[in-house]
Amino acid sequence: MNQPSDLSHTSMSRVEAMHSWSAPNVPALPGRGPQLRLYDSADRQVRPVAPGATATMYVCGITPYDATHLGHAATYLTFDLVHRLWRDSGHDVHYVQNITDVDDPLFERAQRDGIGWRELGDRETELFREDMAALRVLPPRDYVAATEAIAEVVELVEKMLAAGAAYVVDDPQYPDVYFRADATVQFGYESGYDRDTMLALFAERGGDPDRPGKSDPLDALLWLAERPGEPSWPSPFGPGRPGWHVECAAIALSRIGTGLDIQGGGSDLIFPHHEFSAAHAECVTGERRFARHYVHAGMIGWDGHKMSKSRGNLVLVSQLRRDGVDPAAIRLGLFAGHYRDDRFWSPAVLDEALARLHRWRSATALAGAPDATDVVARVRRYLADDLDTPKALAALDGWATDALTYGGHDATAGTTVATAVDALLGIAL
């Protein structure tokens, strides 16, 4: 892996004010877990993840105006598993996550609620941190707000302009800066979508294909020129604020550098967000791939639809916690399905998770239980095979059923299983 980019060295000061959340204790297991294999969205296949001594991962964070729904939780729990499995196999982990704390949806919600956008963002970010701590998610090493990375964004945009990969639209009032979608020959490799699909998703997911003055409807916003009533920062190309995709490229390059092991997020980020953030980085570094693996979690639904802020069909982690739901059951409920699958949350899913948690706690509390060596090995193996949580949970169910039905003579088995469940699945029994 190369060193972090010199994007961090600009004439604009960089403020490191954002903090993450307290890390849960992670017990160590004997030996080392097997090599992790994950589905790569770009290659459309499961293949080994082969980091160096330090594994690197960038996961896109929230836009803090309605945190934290179970769709968010499913994504961050997915990459928490990756983090834990890397640690179990002997790697140090450099995990970076951003917060998109300057964006149109945030401004719109703040205006609707009669609150300042910074106040809203700070409040929802703090709630997100509380939810992540309650869910026992391992925190990122670098937790970076977009507003803390303006200097890096400005320098990255300058490099793209100098390389001819970006241009300023001919608009005296709003001279926005755009990225040329054809700036890299490999553009489109991550999603594999055809142009019509790209255009449809671009319009649906925050793009502006009809913006006058663009060279191509797919060209993506890098720098939005200052608008009345909106925050802005100075730059060589005029006051304004960052586009969405360039924030992640700049933060990842400045904190980790090239050779990123995993870029991750929800499957709705494959295009345009991840496709463009990768292209932004690739066009200035010359790298063929921004990340060795592109990993995406499926969507969580409720009442027959994908859970989303725009639809308003949200099940919030904070509300479940206020209702007295054990956060360990939330983890188990989301782990009951495979991370790549779109799936639905329901009262039945929660009830099953609570019952499973009770069985596991009862089994691990027994004075004697069946030997745990095989079940721990199988859980490690299943999780290393593209995070197969359904098989891992089924293996633990089998051990717990045997323990509760037949007992056993191993006085340490319960502790062994509880330690493995804590270390690998993040669930305290």
Curated annotation (Swiss-Prot):
Monomer. GO terms for cellular component: cytosol. Pfam families: tRNA-synt_1e. Keywords: ATP-binding, Ligase, Metal-binding, Nucleotide-binding, Zinc. Zn(2+) binds at residues 60, 248, 273. Signal peptide: none annotated. Its EC number is 6.3.1.13. A motif ('ERGGDP' region) lies at residues 204-209. The keyword Protease does not apply. It comes from the Bacteria. Catalyzes the ATP-dependent condensation of GlcN-Ins and L-cysteine to form L-Cys-GlcN-Ins. One of its GO terms (molecular function) is zinc ion binding. InterPro entries: Cys-tRNA/MSH_ligase, Mycothiol_ligase_MshC, Rossmann-like_a/b/a_fold, tRNA-synt_1_cat_dom. The keyword Nucleotide-binding applies. This is L-cysteine:1D-myo-inositol 2-amino-2-deoxy-alpha-D-glucopyranoside ligase. It comes from Mycolicibacterium vanbaalenii (strain DSM 7251 / JCM 13017 / BCRC 16820 / KCTC 9966 / NRRL B-24157 / PYR-1).
